[in-house]
């Protein structure tokens, strides 16, 4: 569905006193639908009482996984400082900005193992050719739930690098936890492991 359609669906549900359905529709739309600036502002203003903290967290996480940086930065206003630091660190890593170590150091301890942050740290290290450091971090990474294909991409690239370094055992350990269930990802994962 579209952002405008979701906005009007919630409005109609509320007008018809279907509050529970309106809450669910608003929360689902807020978390899963990309919204342009104007409709996002309108949606937030009109339906903010229907949204919970966890809806804002889930929206921010999804926007960051999709690399929707402008929308993520707008979302920061609705977040606690802890999640602001987390998002800013993820964005700094995505953009390969200077001072990423400082940005990561500002992330509170209880969020340092956030899968999105760990993923961006692995990716940043790989792109900076800090392969061994990226591999070490990847071995400590949480089981990929969200963005399994992105995680697999990093595992695949680093496994191939290990093979080129004649480190087949390490490549096997890294690729054997690919968690791909179909398609080319499964084929590559099984071949590498």
Each model region followed by its residue ranges:
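Alpha-helical solenoid repeat scaffolds
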Residues: 1-193
